[in-house]
């Protein structure tokens, strides 16, 4: 059976082309002894296999065989593409691989049915384009194994929302350029959360900018609250 999943602790999680940017960064945090909730990745190759075995890939290729149309037409194509992904059956071996990884995660957590978040983790092949996490709809929350295959397909389908298509079109989008994995990670209730990123400083180097909020970072991602902001030399 093909390997459809990679745990964040496994060496394969170093490969952005397999696990996507977000999962790769989580693996690096683990390597540096930073505490990260347990999880695994449904690999980018799994999406390729799903599209091929379900017939969805041929339907999507037909939809995107011409240049993307104007706004109204784009909305129609987007809806058809999303429906194609969500309406296609996942093969038994792919579903079994994903459920098997979830059950292994449950044993790690000593929990019968761990609550997990299921965002998409994208890499552009072969590193031609920047990565913008906020472009994609994300983070379904699953409470047991029965909804997991649906959540994974929803993550894949987020590649074909109008927002995603506009972004891809703006950077010279091609179907073959996009490789998307799905991160399945134990969902915890944080006391505080946030994001950290680098920004140029006045001397030509980089400082670290940290934006933090109480509770979940979802409020920060959606712009609902004003974060505490710190700049570190």
Please give the residue ranges for each predicted region.
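Low-complexity, compositionally biased segments
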Residues: 107, 204, 229-231
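Short beta-strand elements
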Residues: 120-124, 137, 186, 195-216
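N-terminal beta-alpha lobe that positions the nucleotide/phosphoryl donor
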Residues: 1-183, 190-192
